C-alpha cells in the first residue's frame, strides 16, 4: 500500500541515492526491495535500494546471491539491525 509514510520513505531514498548502488549509473533508476514483497518484504528504508534498470534485472536473475550481497551493503550503511524488521 502506498500511503503517506511510504511516499516519504521512497522520496528519501530518491533524494539520498542519486545513482545505482551497484554500478554507479545515473540512468533509469528504480527502487528495489531487498526482501521482495512476495517474501513479506516491507518498505523499511533498510529494505530499499536504488538500482539502474540493468542491475535491477541482474539482481532479479539470482535472488539469493544478490539478496545476501545487498543485505551486507545495507548493514555497512545502517549498522547492525534485525533483518526480521524488513518483513511484515
Where are these regions (language model features)?
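Short, charged surface segments at domain edges that flank catalytic/cofactor-binding sites
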Residues: 1-19, 40-42, 69-72, 77-87
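Charge-rich, low-complexity amphipathic helices
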Residues: 31, 53, 57, 73-81
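Histidine-centered nuclease catalytic patch
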Residues: 21-50
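Short Cys/His-centered divalent metal-binding micro-motifs
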Residues: 28, 48-69
Amino acid at each position: 500500500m502506498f500511503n503517506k509514510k511510504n511516499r516519504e520513505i521512497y522520496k528519501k531514498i530518491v533524494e539520498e541515492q542519486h545513482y545505482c548502488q551497484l554500478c554507479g549509473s545515473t540512468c533509469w533508476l528504480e527502487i528495489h526491495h531487498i526482501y521482495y514483497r512476495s517474501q513479506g518484504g516491507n518498505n523499511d528504508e533498510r529494505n530499499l535500494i536504488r538500482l539502474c534498470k540493468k542491475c535491477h534485472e541482474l539482481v532479479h536473475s539470482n535472488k539469493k546471491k544478490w539478496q545476501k550481497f545487498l543485505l551486507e551493503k545495507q548493514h555497512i550503511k545502517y549498522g547492525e539491525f534485525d533483518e526480521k524488521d524488513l518483513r511484515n
